[in-house]
From Swiss-Prot:
One of its GO terms (biological process) is translation. The keyword Repeat does not apply. InterPro entries: Ribosomal_eS24 (IPR001976). The lineage of its organism: Eukaryota, Metazoa, Ecdysozoa, Nematoda, Chromadorea. It comes from Caenorhabditis elegans. Keywords: Ribonucleoprotein, Ribosomal protein. One of its GO terms (cellular component) is ribonucleoprotein complex. Transmembrane segments: none annotated. Pfam families: Ribosomal_S24e. This is Small ribosomal subunit protein eS24. GO terms for molecular function: structural constituent of ribosome.
């Protein structure tokens, strides 16, 4: 078991002792270890994805609320920008 390797000779080991030992080994603060776990990273990614989804939904709603002429103007600008990027890449 990992606890036996980290703290030999102890029949029971507290999680705090293990965290402190690992933190000392890697020269980091034990309190910051919990912030950098794979689960917390997954949580950050999930929050970012959710925020981007909300932003996209708000953008779509604002776009749909625009008058038709303004939408056409935006679309023509996007097309012109894409066309310029493509022609620049193929030089």
């Amino acid at each position: 078991m990992v606890a036996e390797v980290i703290l030999p000779g102890r029949p029971t080991t507290l999680k705090a002792d293990i965290r402190e030992k690992i933190a000392n080994f890697y020269n980091i603060n034990p309190d910051t270890m919990a912030k950098n776990t794979p689960l917390s990273q997954d949580d950050k990614v999930a929050k970012t994805v959710e925020q981007r989804r909300k932003d996209a939904a708000a953008h779509k709603e604002a776009y749909n609320a625009m008058p038709e002429a303004e939408r056409r103007h935006l679309n023509s600008e996007k097309y012109a920008n894409r066309k310029a990027e493509v022609s620049y890449k193929h030089r």
